[in-house]
Amino acid sequence: MANLADGKLELLTDRNSVLVLVDYQSAMFKSVASGDKTIIKHAAIFAAKAASILGVPVVLSSINPKSLGEFIPEITRLFPGQEVFARTMPSFDAFEDERTWNAVRKTGRKKLVISGLWTSMCFAYTALHGLKEGLEAYGLIDAAGDSTPDAHKYGVERMLQAGVIPITLESLVSEWMHDWGNPKAGELVKEVYSKYGAMIGLQ
């Protein structure tokens, strides 16, 4: 019988989640070879867009932007004036950067929705750190990529074995929206579902 006190049985909402996106930078994308770069990139963009529509707090982290490029503007422009935390400690784990971790902690949200580049490194290590801190981690898998298909596959498997819950863009947005009575439903359909659906061939 399911433990009804288990937070994992509670759906993601715009009130219990924080979205963390790690290292969506130009040089990182160049090395992605585990899937369609355009779809991976836009899954992250549309997750950020949905968060901006629904008011879900978002934390952005980058590594060595002078060499690897700035965080992609398609996401940063959704959050004007918000700082991208360029890690002062060049760690693969974004939460080893105190400012990044404090930004997440201060939201008070227990459900960590996270994705990043690359899957097996910065995404995985940060997600595992979130678990160690007592958060429930939800890995946005279709917004992640790695240098090879195997690197992505086994990075995902490592996270799942540790307790990260896999999720896709469409399931994430649907959970956040909850039902068609949501006053933001029309905007989500126009700005997220329809555009992403057309990109992946649903329309």
PLM regions with names:
Residues 2-18, 54, 66-203:
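Active-site-adjacent betaalpha module
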Residues 15-17, 33-59:
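A short alpha/beta connector and helix-capping loop motif
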Residues 17, 22-25:
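Catalytic-site beta-strand/loop segments enriched in glycine and acidic/polar residues
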Residues 21-22, 57-63:
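Short beta-strand segments at enzyme active-site cores
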Residues 22, 46-47, 130-132:
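Short, flexible segments with low predicted structural confidence
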Residues 26-31:
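Short acidic, Gly/Ser-rich segments with clustered Asp/Glu that frequently serve as metal-coordination loops
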Residues 32-35, 63, 151:
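Short, solvent-exposed loop/turn segments at secondary-structure boundaries
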Residues 37-38, 63-64, 145:
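A short linear-motif detector with a strong N-terminal bias
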